[in-house]
Amino acid sequence: MFENLSERLERSLKILKGEGKITEVNVAETLKDVRKALLDADVNYKVAKQFTDTVKEKALGMNVLTSVRPGQLMVKVVHDELAALMGGEAVDIDIKGHPAVILMAGLQGSGKTTFSAKLANLLKTKRAKKPLLAACDVYRPAAIDQLKVLGEQIGVTVYTEPGNNKPVEIALNAIKEARAKGFDVVIIDTAGRLAIDEMMMQEITAIKEAVSPNEILFVVDSMTGQDAVNTAKEFNERLDFSGVILTKLDGDTRGGAALSIRTVVEKPIKFVGTGEKMDAFDVFHPDRMADRILGMGDIVSFVERAQEQFDAEQAKRLQKKMGKGKFDYNDFLEQIGQIKKMGNMKDIMGMIPGVGKAIKDLDINDDAFKGIEAMIYSMTPAERMNPELLDKSQSRRNRIAKGSGQSIQEVSRMIKQFEQTRKMMKNVAGAKLPNLGSMMRR
């Protein structure tokens, strides 16, 4: 995400790397480039100007230690101001109450329904809550069906009232249902609407007044840039929402919405969507996003995702096998499964400091795992447990290629990389994950 902006900012900040000290001249030259990079990233003009003015004031006003180079200082100031621009600190959602009520709002197609299910899944799996999804989009039958499918997928109850076309009534009845059956949180999925559609705006205002929600979350598509910011501003004037959800952030190479929306509407970004899977969204951490924009990675989020998928018993067993050099294809399958659970591979690798830039132009293909898995599943149980059987047997490789639908060259390549991984894992005795990044390239 934000690859174009990251590259431009890195080039801009290089101007100061060869300088001996900070001066008004070299700061002005650097920030001229920074401002242009922000504007090209579709950042609001006033926000970009305010940002560069603040960075200039702080950079020229700091007492610089002789050991700190001007380039390092400017990166520090830009990082801190980027984080401040996006809110400074992560802001949690309010789920107090019996039940807590969360009202979703936004344009049609912004991802409200999918996000409603993702939020329910997070509350269920990570907050030990019992959520209820309320289907209040009475204008689009497919939205109710979609919510039912997603609810079934994550094991969350969906409240519907077939035949009732009054969203306020449905929302109130959903809350009654929650109280009666012990649900902790009610998430109200509403119809998409335009801020200029007076009838629809009156409807969601009526829902707000009727249910007195803990949170009103406004969902916007980050890839629409300044349109997202302008829409959020119009909705906020009518609804006074409590937070913003940015969806489709994984496809946003510019970052204009993420960098502008907090300042323009003065409401925090609470979550960001990074894919279609139910766990493909994150709490928004402004400081970590600033790290990623400046090419520093996001090692904290990387470790958190890894820990979520960590199986202590499996790790102990694997460590013993690796110490004895017994790592086999069954273990390899388990490792692939753990890594797949962490999310989009390019996004995950981009969290590792220094890796984001290196993989920018590579086609990191999540589907490549399917080919590797197909090759392993095409092996006999004996071959999976005894990798050396494949070392010099061309007939076995031919059979695996035919059974998996892969070429013989791909099978040989996978075996070679598996052997390299096995040697590495024996040396580190399970201290690190295998380097599967190269196996994702196509």
Where are these regions (language model features)?
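Short, small-residue-enriched loops and turns at beta-alpha junctions
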Residues: G109-S110, Y139-P141, N165-P167, G192-I196, ...
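Short, surface-exposed connector motifs at secondary-structure boundaries
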Residues: K126-L132, I154-V158, D184-V186, V211-I216, ...
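Long amphipathic alpha-helical segments used for membrane anchoring, targeting, substrate engagement
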Residues: F2-E19, R288-R442
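Primarily NTPase-proximal linker/entry elements flanking Walker-type ATP/GTP-binding cores
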Residues: R8-C136, A143-N164, A171-T190
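Conserved phosphate-handling catalytic cores of large alpha/beta enzymes
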Residues: A171-I175, R179, F183, A195, ...
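Residue-level signature of catalytic and energy-coupling elements of molecular machines
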Residues: L16, D42-N44, V78, L107, ...
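Amphipathic alpha-helical interaction segments
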Residues: E29, D33, Q50, T54, ...
